[in-house]
Amino acid sequence: MPVSEFLIHPEYEILLILYRDIFVDEALLKNRFSREFQEAAAAIRLDEMDIKKIGLKEGGNARISGSSKAIVARVIKDQKPHQGYAFMPLSPWSNSLMHFNGENFAAMRVAKVKISHTTLPVTGLQELL
């Protein structure tokens, strides 16, 4: 484990919104354990201002903590500005960050999460199962 992982990276609260993605769905249908599926599904889209504020790099990794679990996902810079909001495709990675209260499935699509810089590798699908 690199020394940088022992340093405290500040966490920022952000609103995470889940969406369906045709490329993730296609990769899932081909092989849910493939590298193609992991690269498409374990990614978080942030705008340029949030990437700079949090200290992330496009293509780098971010640690995202939900109410019950934390994952590591790859950072993608979105073309449109949407400061304070992040987007992830529906997948085992994004679903692990959501909290279901048993009443409203729509509430599972939006959650406040904490995000910070990390040098750890992207969370593997086997770790989520």
Could you tell me what each predicted segment is?
Residues M1-L129:
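Long, contiguous, secondary-structure-rich segments that constitute the structural scaffold
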